[in-house]
Amino acid sequence: MKKQGILHRDLAALIASLGHGDLVVVADSGLPVPPGVPCIDLAVTKGVPSFLPVLEAILSEMVVENATVAEELKPNEQIIEALAGRLKPVQLHFINHESLKTCCRQARAVIRTGEWTPYANILLYAGVAF
């Protein structure tokens, strides 16, 4: 039994299996998961677990070289600032929400949280540790 880090077996296995350039999506509770894309559903109730703590856990174990969110999230300055701070030195990129949903088709998995904030979704592209 693991005693630290990500304990969810499917999430831990996903991160361990990632290769350079692989896409993982951390999503709010409303993002549609494209057919054929695995969904690791962590949502329990409205807001539980929330987006940022799940993202923090993933970032503690995943090498990220690129991160993208929807332009529609920009008015939520609190989340944008939180994301920018947690992702440093990786720069946060923006695309429209429809394009973000299209990108999800290429994801290795969508991690569904209980987040209730509109557009609280992020595309994380795996980097390499060397």
Swiss-Prot record:
Origin organism lineage: Bacteria, Bacillati, Bacillota, Clostridia, Eubacteriales
EC number(s) recorded for this UniProt protein: 5.4.99.62
Superkingdom in the source lineage: Bacteria
Active site residues of this protein: 20 (proton donor)
Gene: rbsD
Protein name: D-ribose pyranase
Family: Belongs to the RbsD / FucU family. RbsD subfamily.
Subcellular location: Cytoplasm
Described purpose of this protein according to its UniProt entry: Catalyzes the interconversion of beta-pyran and beta-furan forms of D-ribose.
Keyword Nucleotide-binding: no
GO MF, any single term: monosaccharide binding
Binding site for substrate: 28, 97, 119-121
Listed pathway(s): Carbohydrate metabolism; D-ribose degradation; D-ribose 5-phosphate from beta-D-ribopyranose: step 1/2
One Pfam family from the record: RbsD_FucU
Predominant cellular place of this UniProt entry's protein: cytoplasm
Key word Cytoplasm present: yes
Subunit structure of this chain's protein: Homodecamer.
Enzyme class, spelled out: isomerase
Keyword annotations from UniProtKB, A to Z: Carbohydrate metabolism, Cytoplasm, Isomerase
